[in-house]
């Protein structure tokens, strides 16, 4: 019985049974039932009742898109409204974003202004340093003129000292040389303005400077000969070392200094570079006072240690 009622409700027979029981509507042929045909409607509502006498409040579907709007229950026209333009989403308010752009433009203007001021300052400094250069050039020309005057005075003195350098009319040759070509005179002025070379060794103030010795073939030959002399000297002064036994004994190297007949024997130690007698050399090695110090000294004739 329950299954028949259930099928009757969904099959359309429930309406006749309800009309027979007195629960139907006053108007015949019009039913107040909601259609459950699962048909999609505008606004996201299912089973919309299009009858004008349906006055029940229905829930409208909410939407996150502004262009989707629900159909009002009071309006019978199911056509949607005109879509609204999509708004731009922003994480910052409009006022804050405008303030940020305004601040950035102001910073850019300040930077451009500072850059322009620096450029103007550089140009002004460069223009102020330009007038000083002619003064320096004038000073250089004055020095050149003074050198030319000294040179002309010296040339006149030399021409007066040497009568053969004078012409038949008695005028000095240096006066005629002044009428040379401008290029030759300019070269002379440049040469006179240059400082004296190292070959003369005499600067303008008259003091003589000591020249640095040049390495020539003769100096190399002298160096080679001196090296050979050192080898000969080392052959004459052989290498010696101490031979001391005991807890305080140590080996000290030295060489036998060249001595002549009748002179005392002296040994120079390598560690301190001092001259000692044989007894002092053995004592320096930690042997103490010995009766025959020459027995504690070993002679090594090889001079390769010092070469």
UniProtKB/Swiss-Prot annotation:
PANTHER family: AFP HOMOLOG 2, NINJA-FAMILY PROTEIN OS03G0419100. Keywords: Nucleus. Pfam families: EAR (PF07897), NLS_NINJA_AFP (PF16136), TDBD (PF16135). Signal peptide: none annotated. Belongs to the Ninja family. The keyword Nucleus applies. Residues 153-165, 173-225 have a biased composition (Polar residues). The keyword Nucleus applies. It comes from the Eukaryota. InterPro entries: Ninja_fam, Ninja_motif, NLS_NINJA_AFP-like, TDBD. Residues 1-30, 67-225 are annotated as: Disordered. Its main location: nucleus. It is found in: Nucleus. Residues 84-94 have a biased composition (Low complexity). Residues 99-111 have a biased composition (Basic and acidic residues). It comes from Oryza sativa subsp. japonica. GO terms for biological process: negative regulation of DNA-templated transcription; signal transduction. This is Ninja-family protein Os03g0419100. One of its GO terms (cellular component) is nucleus.
């Amino acid at each position: 019985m329950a299954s028949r009622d259930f099928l009757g409700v969904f099959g359309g027979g429930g309406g006749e049974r309800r009309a027979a029981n007195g629960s139907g509507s006053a108007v015949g042929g019009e039913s107040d039932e909601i259609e459950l045909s699962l048909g999609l409607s505008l606004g996201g509502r299912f089973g919309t009742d299009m009858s004008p006498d349906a006055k029940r409040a229905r829930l409208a579907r909410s939407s996150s898109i502004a262009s989707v709007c629900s159909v009002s229950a009071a309006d019978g026209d199911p056509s949607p409204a005109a879509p609204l333009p999509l708004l731009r989403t922003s994480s910052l308010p409009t006022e804050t974003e405008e303030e940020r752009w305004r601040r950035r433009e102001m910073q850019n203007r300040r930077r451009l202004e500072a850059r322009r001021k620096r450029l103007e300052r550089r140009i002004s400094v460069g223009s102020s340093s330009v007038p000083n250069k002619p003064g320096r050039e004038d000073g250089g020309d004055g020095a050149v003129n003074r050198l030319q005057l000294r040179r002309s005075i010296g040339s006149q003195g030399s021409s007066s000292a040497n009568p053969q350098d004078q012409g038949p009319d008695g005028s000095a040759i240096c006066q005629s040389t002044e009428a040379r070509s401008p290029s030759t005179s300019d070269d002379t002025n440049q040469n006179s303005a240059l400082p004296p070379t190292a070959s003369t060794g005499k600067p303008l103030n008259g003091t003589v400077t000591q020249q640095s010795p040049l390495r020539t073939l003769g100096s190399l030959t002298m160096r080679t000969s001196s090296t050979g002399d050192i080898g000969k000297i080392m052959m004459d002064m052989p290498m010696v070392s101490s031979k001391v036994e005991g807890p305080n004994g140590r080996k000290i190297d030295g060489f036998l200094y060249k001595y002549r007949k009748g002179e005392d024997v002296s040994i120079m130690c390598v560690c301190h570079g001092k001259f000692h007698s044989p007894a002092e050399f053995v004592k320096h090695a930690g042997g103490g006072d010995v009766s025959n110090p020459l027995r504690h000294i070993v002679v090594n004739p090889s001079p390769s240690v010092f070469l």
